[in-house]
């Protein structure tokens, strides 16, 4: 697979879980003999939701909730067939969203 690049984007709400998953991917691929760039931390997406505390009145009393989406980017340059096979078998947590582009 000379001249190819695999780009992996990880998304999660928990920054500790995404860092552990990224470390697992990097360790697995480097053991298989491919070169890795990353994990590169991408900007954290922050969604803020404003909710009125009371169901009927007291509009001035509001509560804010936020949801942060942490993202990481990993590039695998010139992946070996062994590296691709080990990536397919890798077991990662369910709360990490993985996008793979060739």
From Swiss-Prot:
This is Small ribosomal subunit protein uS10. The lineage of its organism: Bacteria, Bacillati, Actinomycetota, Actinomycetes, Micrococcales. GO terms for molecular function: structural constituent of ribosome; tRNA binding. Keywords: Ribonucleoprotein, Ribosomal protein. Belongs to the universal ribosomal protein uS10 family. GO terms for biological process: translation. Involved in the binding of tRNA to the ribosomes. HAMAP family: Ribosomal_uS10. Gene3D superfamilies: Ribosomal protein S10 domain. Pfam families: Ribosomal_S10. PROSITE patterns: RIBOSOMAL_S10 (PS00361). Part of the 30S ribosomal subunit. InterPro entries: Ribosomal_uS10, Ribosomal_uS10_CS, Ribosomal_uS10_dom, Ribosomal_uS10_dom_sf. It comes from Micrococcus luteus (strain ATCC 4698 / DSM 20030 / JCM 1464 / CCM 169 / CCUG 5858 / IAM 1056 / NBRC 3333 / NCIMB 9278 / NCTC 2665 / VKM Ac-2230). The keyword Ribosomal protein applies. PANTHER family: 30S RIBOSOMAL PROTEIN S10 FAMILY MEMBER. SMART domains: Ribosomal_S10. One of its GO terms (cellular component) is ribosome. Signal peptide: none annotated.
């Amino acid at each position: 697979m000379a001249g190819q690049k695999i780009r992996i984007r990880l998304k999660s709400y928990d920054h500790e879980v995404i860092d552990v998953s990224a470390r697992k991917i990097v360790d697995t691929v480097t053991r298989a003999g491919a070169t890795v760039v990353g994990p590169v931390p991408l900007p954290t997406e922050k969604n803020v939701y404003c909710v009125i505390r009371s169901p009927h009145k007291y509009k001035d009393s509001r509560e804010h909730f936020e949801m942060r989406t942490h993202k990481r980017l990993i590039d695998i340059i010139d992946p070996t067939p062994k590296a691709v096979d080990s990536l397919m078998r890798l077991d990662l947590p369910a709360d990490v969203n993985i996008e793979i582009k060739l």
